[in-house]
Amino acid sequence: MAEKSVELDSIELAAAIFGNCDQNVKLLENEFHVTAVCRGSLLKFTGEPKDVEAAVHAVDGMVTLMQNHTPLEEQTVRYCISLARGGEEKRLRELNDDFVAVTAKGRPIHPKTLGQKEYLSAIRANSITFGVGPAGTGKTYLAVAMAVKAFKSKDVSRIILTRPAVEAGEKLGFLTGDMQNKKDTYLRPLYHGLIALLGAETFQKLVEKQAIEVAPLAYMRGRTLDDAFIILDEAQNTTPEQMKMFLTRMGVGSKVVVTGDVTQVDLPEKTRSGLVDALHILRGIDGIAQVYLTEKDVVRHRLVQQIVKAYERAAQPPKRAPQAKPETANA
């Protein structure tokens, strides 16, 4: 058995690290199979040497996030634990250094996982970036944040957000209300990120000035989109023809981000996904990046991560037991 203590800088920091009713400490105990004792600003672990060392590394990662004013929610603590198991907790400092934008309420936006950081770096470095991954990985929200940052710094003169009109089995014709209401209904998820970043009043003014456009994918046909930050969301529900049409709308001074989840295709049976097609066809082209986020990058409720993993397992074909070779009769 080994024993190791961590002396935190203040009672306030200790309270944040320990969590409400010591919930973070209990999580560390359960995940690393150690015993923890909290006294003032001191946290002492007892257990197997490698488990104690990993628990200390996880606390180091939590301290790093606190220094960057990142709230220690359960999912954040679990991510620290995941990195500590691989000895990568020091890489959390990289997240602190990567500032994206500030919300309308003054909250700074940083990547919450190393996968998200890779995604942001790809967007900065490339003209077209594909962000592929399950729900909850922040791929759309971070793309919107990067678009707002580019707009505010005058790198682009407008923001365009679009998505195909097929999702969860619905088409615009089957939604209630007039066409504008139908558009608003299925494009609403794209509004949320913009309103959070800009505030409702600023967002509305920019829409009226046509500096922000949120429209169905069909509205992109026949246009050349210059000097714009363009985001195609739910791209798994495009056909190959739609994807080609969209990508070839890109004009001078524009940047494109395409987001989607290849496991959630809602197209009619036997219709190929334009996203899957594009990922294959455009692989290796300079200026086009592909970033794959995983369940480790899910930053919603911890159950979302487990749900994603369960569905991924269910999607895998069952393993067949090896068949015994038929016995041959001796001549």
Where are the predicted features?
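Short glycine-/aliphatic-rich beta-strand segments at the starts of folded cytosolic domains
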Residues: 1-16
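Conserved loop-to-helix interface motifs that mediate assembly, gating, or partner/ligand docking
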Residues: 86-114
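Conserved helicase motor core of SF1/SF2 NTP-dependent helicases
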Residues: 42, 104-116, 122-232, 236-331
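A short, structured beta-strand/loop element
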Residues: 29-37
